[in-house]
């Protein structure tokens, strides 16, 4: 078999393939063997009918068509491997020559990853906002911890912000009760905003057994997007009493003996969270900076597939009702055209990021180890509240492991870029990225820079 590649565009190629007829002989033998098992010819045991009789029975052209159809995927895969192209999506295959006893010829057009001119990661400069852990941040965490150990006590007064109430709810549209919109004895924290819009405002000032009506827009169900009249009745009111933030509370709520030790620990926890958030901003800034510097041609078929998938998902959530989608968009102040344009822009950005990170991973020769995959598997399973083995089984069952592998490889690639880049906050202070992106390999530019600074310091000390 021989193949050649034509570059149709930076993101699309045509692979021309020629397969000598002799190379199809094993395919013919397999086809005859399978067919012989399925048919019975007088005088022959099942599976023993000769090929010539099968050809006479079913026709040589029909056999050729079957062999070619079954042979194309493997021959296409072989051509891809030999040409070292990186296909994206499924090919469009056209058989250009198919005659018994002669070579098989076909073409395969497919989108491919474009060649990208990538900058030196060491020349990349990234700047993000600084982080600061304030006393107010610590107070908020302490307040949240106190709330977890608080007690609820019934009160005989109107509802106030922060109270816990038991309520009955019902909703109507044009006087007709909305199915599934009735609830009794529902617990709710006033001011949390966890239920329907307008409820918290209606509850403030209400007393036990008092009812009040308000109008809200339904966000789910068959009446999503419509205005409904909601009636709320207060059945009970409780306030939360918080423990005093003292040493006794610290011993109750933590492993620490004093409130000062507890506050110090909370400060460290807040710092970790803020550093993690800053790391995400660093990652996003690194990708955005690279996207600005690198020209990335887009494979149209891949972008279109992603747009179609997003549109399908939006309609699926609305039972594929186009009119409901129009209603939802109208409530958001968007036209269908604006929605589709936004969806396409998001798809283009997403595809560009994937192409960029894949190219970086190739250039940096990123290798994904078992430990990397296990770490991602454990983190993702924790996020969804399931066991890692459950997630692994789901990924295998739905053929999603390759996607996870690719995602981990991209994460490792951008981490390597960040390790090599110069990362500072907007005040000009260097940010240590090792906590989330790993340490720079010894002997790189950062180590050389540290050595230079040490030499300068030694020289200065010697001159004093």
Swiss-Prot record:
Keyword Metal-binding assigned: no
Keyword annotations: Cell cycle, Cell division, Chaperone, Cytoplasm, Isomerase, Rotamase
Enzyme class: isomerase
Highest taxon above the source species: Bacteria
Region (Disordered) location: 431-464
GO cellular component: cytoplasm
HAMAP family membership: Trigger_factor_Tig
Gene: tig
Protein localization: Cytoplasm
Compositionally biased tracts (Acidic residues): 446-455
Domain PPIase FKBP-type: 162-243
Name of the protein in its database record: Trigger factor
Catalytic reaction(s) noted: [protein]-peptidylproline (omega=180) = [protein]-peptidylproline (omega=0)
Annotated PROSITE patterns: FKBP_PPIASE
GO molecular function, one term: peptidyl-prolyl cis-trans isomerase activity
Family classification: Belongs to the FKBP-type PPIase family. Tig subfamily.
Main location class: cytoplasm
Record InterPro entries: PPIase_dom_sf, PPIase_FKBP_dom, Trig_fac, Trigger_fac_C, Trigger_fac_C_sf, Trigger_fac_ribosome-bd_bac, Trigger_fac_ribosome-bd_sf, Trigger_fact/SurA_dom_sf
GO biological process: 'de novo' cotranslational protein folding; cell division; chaperone-mediated protein folding; protein transport; protein unfolding
Coiled coil feature spans: none
Domain comment as written in the entry: Consists of 3 domains; the N-terminus binds the ribosome, the middle domain has PPIase activity, while the C-terminus has intrinsic chaperone activity on its own.
EC number: 5.2.1.8
Keyword Chaperone set for record: yes
Free-text function comment from the UniProt entry: Involved in protein export. Acts as a chaperone by maintaining the newly synthesized protein in an open conformation. Functions as a peptidyl-prolyl cis-trans isomerase.
